[in-house]
């Protein structure tokens, strides 16, 4: 019996010592993974808000499959339209037809804008609809930096997407004409300067389109309302007015997208109150100004709410 009591005392003493040791010396924390150093989060927290927002938005855009498919479908429509319209011009245009390098990318200017509107409005407002925007503010409580980061990345991707559409449209158009024994050489630019000018036109349209989309998305804060307003403005409001009518010529000259596409579409000079260079500047000032105003008002509203 004494042996049993001695063994139980030894066991209880051993357990008591182990408990005391564990309380005095707590368990060591697990080492961080080599691919994620311990100072990474601290370094990210000390970065400027805009830089953190740019990194976060880029991570989202890279894995936005739905946005990629929207741009892909837009590119397919633009390329198909460019090739089809160029073939029709060369076949049935007769002697009056004057094909050029612009005709080979006509689909980009006809349809890319609408695809970008859908892509922009969806990307900007899906977080508002799902409530993810409020969750994002917990890690980066700077709504102004988030909106600016979105605007920057959308502009860069829009320019790159439209450039790719233009290259594909030119390649498919020339290839389809060559396969049907049509004079494809008439759709080739006369010089590198002509293609450089087209690249500048595409950049201007992309920048203005994104800025206008950002402004409307912020002002409406609703996906269906934003898309309705964007398409109504371009297709109905700007589509209804004609610069040939002297009674509406002043109003026609004030339409932003009519000014933005003026250099490409090359309408009569008398339709506008100023020259094409002023039209380009007017288009960029109006669209970028609207986007900047929308972001500034959104920031002030958020400050009042706080």
Map each language-model feature to its residues.
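Hydrophobic/aromatic positions within or immediately flanking transmembrane alpha-helices
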Residues: 71, 134, 147, 227-228
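Secretory targeting signals
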Residues: 38-46, 67, 71-123, 147-220, ...
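Helix-capping/transition residues at the boundaries of transmembrane alpha-helices
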Residues: 60, 125, 136-138, 213, ...
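Transmembrane helix boundary and interhelical loop/hinge segments in multi-pass membrane proteins
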Residues: 120-139, 144
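Membrane-helix interface segments
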Residues: 66, 142-144, 222-226
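Junction motif at the cytosolic side of a transmembrane helix
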Residues: 4, 10, 14-37, 282-306
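Aromatic- and glycine-rich beta-strand/loop motifs that create alpha-glucan
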Residues: 28-73
